[in-house]
Structure formats: structure tokens, C-alpha cells
Amino acid sequence: MVKGKKTIYFCQNCGYESGKWMGQCPGCKEWNTFVEETVSKTERTNARSIREEKSPVTLSGISLEDESRMNSGMKELDRVLGGGIVRGSLVLVGGDPGIGKSTLLLQVCRNLTDQKRKVLYISGEESLAQIKMRAKRIGEFGESLYLLCETNLEVIRKAIEKMRPEVVVIDSIQTMYQEEISSAPGSVSQVRESTSILMQIAKGMNITIFIVGHVTKEGVVAGPRVLEHMVDTVLYFEGDRHAVYRILRGVKNRFGSTNEIGVFEMRTEGLAEVENPSEFMLNGRPEDASGSVVACSMEGTRPILIEIQALICQSNLGIPRRTAAGTDYNRVNLLMAVLEKRAGLHLSSCDAYINIAGGIKMNEPAIDLGIILAIVSSYKDKVIDEKTIVFGEVGLSGEVRAISMAEQRIMEAKKLGFQRVIYPKVCENERTRIKGIELVGVSNVREAIRAIL
């Protein structure tokens, strides 16, 4: 029975509650993030918890025999999740509209039904016929996939309790609502309470739940920031919706590393895995072009070869223009200052445009040397040998510092046919002395420049 209504102000960034509007949120210190919502006071006499009453147990008394991970049928997704799908986990998948979130999860459902696992796909945005049309494009599905078009969480909870599926997909969290809350679906309170209920279902019934979340124009999942704190895993689907590639990146993972990425290619029949992203990223690289160099970055345990492009030209403006796509803008400015001070290049009057080809975002310090040499190549209009690869971190004194996993990077370069590696001299040891490829160790940026020119 509804007793009455009251007005509460929520912070859209962190979910902080207040009885009055505030200019600055006391929780996250952000400005102008409070929104007004009307909340009903409801007697929850019939409400019951999903969890059963339990007693504390010792750590040694917990068995993990039945807690093996499920295979999603997609190696790239399993890599990002840390080795497979963990039972009872709550996974949030975010990304721009049209990037392929629903397609990815529908393909996961197909793979799980091929393993005879019971899967429930709940959509709040599409009709059953529309889901069938998308599924037909992907391929044949097993008989253990069940569809439900519903946004009422109480109905969804009863359906899950009745079916007892192994995996549930919620598409999307912004369309779900709880009747006890009077605010509209997608509001701060609805998203937070909906996620809380789904978390109870996942943990109480040991069911894996995938949640699709829309992102804002700033690139974060719409709703309170606390949403990301509540779930076990947060995955972001990145990439240009007009391009063929997609990058799945783990931002939070309680059951694995957050450094891994998965690479997919968008095709007519759905998403295809890219098992060798280095070859994929270097496809179409121009020959005999200055300002282009191949660098190696590590994403978790996987080495990825990328093309770094630089265009340096005289500026007609009072303040030269600097642009960086795919890497940190401030890092590029820092490296240009190092070149001007330590290598004697006059870049203060030049426009600079730096790009990571393929649209992938890389911020690992090991690509510093690649950015440095691409800038020098464009500035001096000298072509770097296409069979040369570089990696290394650059300090403010111009020194080339050590990086991790040098051996894996060299092996990846050799596998793809590169003949020369320019890397930090401090990384030279018995493990990195690999036959069949020329290794050039450098101590500073001056030595690196002499090695390529």
C-alpha cells in the first residue's frame, strides 16, 4: 500500500542521495550532477529475498569442484573474461548504439545452446519477431534458448525462478523498472534498484546474468556510477560503428585481468573473431611513406603490432596545432618537448598530427619510442624501413627505459616477418637474443634516431 511520495535528489555520477538540491556532490565532488526524482514510500510486506538464510563457513570448507567456468564459444570473449564465464557473476556490457552489444550476446546465446545449456534472453527494446529476424541472420539456434519481452522486474524474477536457466541476458538495464519505484525506467533510482535485484538473483541462484548498458555522450554507462561498482565485470565495446572492427575491453573484472582485449570483425552474419589482431591492424599499410612506423604494445599477455602515423608540417598559425588520435594527447606533447630539447628538432613552429592506424586506442608507455621515431621520420621526410619494429618507454631526459615482456614482443615481430627490432638496451639479455632477427639496443632518443636514418 502506498503511504505517500517524497522528492529525492540523486547524483547522476555516483548515485549519492540528498533531500535537497546541491551544486556540488559530496560523494564524487562533481558539479551540477543532481537530478530530482519522486520516490514512493511502499510497504514491502509481500517482498521476499531471493537468498536463503545461511550460516558462516570457513574458507577451507568451501568446495570449488562445481565452480568451473563455462566456455562462451568465443575465444576473444573468454580471454577478456579471464578464461570463461563465471557462474553466478553479473556482467555489464556497455557501448555506443549500433556497436554490436546485442549481436555479441546473441551469438554467445547461440554457442551456449549448442552446448545444451538453458539460456533466457530478455529484451525490453525489441519484439519477439524482431529478435527472431536478428537470430536468423546469425545462424541456427538450439532448442534451449528461451525469449521473453518484458520490462517488469517482478515478472522477470518469477520467470527466472520458474525456468532456472544457467545464463540470462538483460537487454537493456535502462528499460527495466520496479513497480514500487514511481520514477521512469532509465532513471537513477530505477537503474540502481534493478541492478541490485539482478545481483541478488545472480548470487542467490548461481545464475550468470549479462546486462546491456547504454553509454552517455561522455562514453560511460548511463545511470549512476555505483552501477559499475555493483557488478562483477564491466566490459566496453569500442570502435567506429562505420568500420568493420570492434574492440572488447575489460574495465573491471573480479575474476581476471583488466588488461586483456578481444578483437572482432563485423560481418553480415554477425561478429567474427580476429585471432591475429597484429596482422589485422597492419593490413593496408602504405609503402615508402615517411612518418609511419610499426610499434608493439602489450594488451595483457597478448602482443599487438600497430602502425603509428605522424604528419609534421610548418604552421601558419600563431599557436601550432597538435592533434592525437588513438593515444594520449598530453603524452604526445611531452614527447615532442623531449625531441626539441634532447634531439635538437625545432618543432615549436610546426603543426603535429599523430594517429594510431586502425582506430585502436593505445596508451602503454612502450609505444613512446614509436611516436618519437614517427615524428622524426615525418619531420625529416625520411622513410623508415617497413621491416623495422620499435618499442620502448622514453623519459624526460631522452633516455629509453626498460619495458616488460620484451621477449614476447620480439617473437611476435619475427612471426609476422619483421627483420629488425629497435628496443631499449637495458632489455638486452640471453632471453631476448633470438636468432633470425636483427636486434638494435638503444639507450636514448639520439641513438634511436641514428638507427633509423
Pin down the residues of each PLM region:
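Peripheral, non-AAA+ core regions of ATP-driven protein-machinery
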Residues: 2-13, 17-79, 86-94, 99-106, ...
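Conserved RecA-like ASCE P-loop NTPase motor core of nucleic-acid helicases/translocases
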Residues: 119-123
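Conserved Walker A/P-loop ATP-binding site and its immediately adjacent core
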Residues: 124-130
